[in-house]
């Protein structure tokens, strides 16, 4: 990671436990993970702040052309090989389910940069970094739903869109509300459903991605699996202060 975002990440991590937001994040972590606040891992706030602040700095301040330089390995080469191994673009239309992970924008940037020439993308989100990214890859923008290109539609499961339909699922033993999508629509237009999850931090040498493919009728299961993956890598999620969106819709 470049000097400025690395410095900013260290400063934010140093201050992480001394803010009012830290109390809210601790309470939300305790609620979601079903543990007393006294059992929240001591380093959780510091690690979470370090992960998020550095990559958020990159996505907000730097142009997308510089994003990949903030990873210690060749992210584009990794993603190109990984998508090939996964047959990631084998469907004519793919609904890609993500969440607001640390560095999610950098991963999507690598997808945009390395996808086959006939693949186009569209984002259903209000996330400013992703709109900034799409503007930088204008040639990848889907011009028409019925254009003769393979299409990847990116939907963030932990974001609430205006007037979006919701469905109820379980986050552990708690009820949660996620964005619903018509399985009839997905089936009619030949969509497959895919998840996109980090195995560990983009800072780590052992970084990797995992993805599962689902049939259109299993959309809700894919969405629930995406949410519950949060339990594996809680320090990488950027929305611990926004848990009410999931619990109350």
Show the residue positions of the predicted features.
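Generic structural marker for isolated residues within well-ordered, non-membrane alpha-helices
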Residues: 26, 108, 226
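A structural signal for well-ordered alpha-helical scaffolds and beta->alpha junctions
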Residues: 21-22, 26, 130-131, 179, ...
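Membrane-anchoring hydrophobic helices of lipid-metabolizing enzymes
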Residues: 1-98
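Catalytic cores of transferase enzymes with a strong primary signal for eukaryotic protein kinases
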Residues: 51, 55, 111, 231
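Catalytic core of membrane glycerolipid acyltransferases/transacylases, capturing the structured
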Residues: 91-150, 169
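Short catalytic/ligand-binding loop motif for oxyanion handling, primarily in non-cytosolic enzymes
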Residues: 61-66, 103-106, 131-132, 162-164, ...
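Non-catalytic C-terminal accessory region of glycerolipid acyltransferases
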Residues: 42, 92-93, 113-114, 140-249
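Amphipathic coiled-coil/heptad-repeat helices and related helical stalk/stem segments
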Residues: 78-81, 104, 178-179, 222
């Amino acid at each position: 990671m470049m000097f400025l975002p690395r410095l900013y990440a260290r400063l934010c991590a140093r201050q992480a436990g001394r803010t009012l937001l830290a109390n809210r994040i601790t309470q939300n972590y305790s609620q979601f993970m079903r543990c007393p606040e006294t059992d929240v891992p001591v380093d959780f706030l510091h690690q979470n702040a370090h992960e998020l602040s550095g990559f958020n700095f990159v996505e907000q301040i730097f142009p997308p052309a510089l994003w990949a330089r903030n990873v210690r390995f060749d992210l584009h080469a990794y993603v190109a090989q990984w998508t090939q191994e996964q047959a990631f673009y084998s469907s004519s239309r793919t609904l890609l389910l993500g969440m607001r992970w640390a560095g999610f924008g950098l991963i999507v940037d690598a997808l945009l940069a390395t996808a086959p020439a006939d693949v186009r993308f569209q984002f259903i989100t209000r996330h400013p970094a992703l709109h900034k990214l799409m503007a930088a890859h204008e040639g990848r923008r889907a011009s028409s739903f019925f254009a003769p290109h393979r299409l990847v539609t990116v939907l963030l499961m932990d974001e609430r869109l205006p007037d979006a339909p919701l469905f109820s699922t379980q986050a552990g033993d708690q009820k949660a509300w996620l964005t619903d999508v018509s399985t009839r629509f997905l089936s009619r237009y030949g969509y497959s459903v895919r998840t996109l999850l980090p195995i560990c931090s983009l800072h780590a040498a052992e970084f990797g991605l995992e993805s599962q493919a689902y049939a259109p009728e299993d959309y809700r299961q894919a969405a629930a699996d995406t949410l519950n993956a949060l339990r594996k890598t809680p320090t990488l999620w950027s929305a611990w202060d926004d848990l009410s969106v999931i619990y109350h819709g």
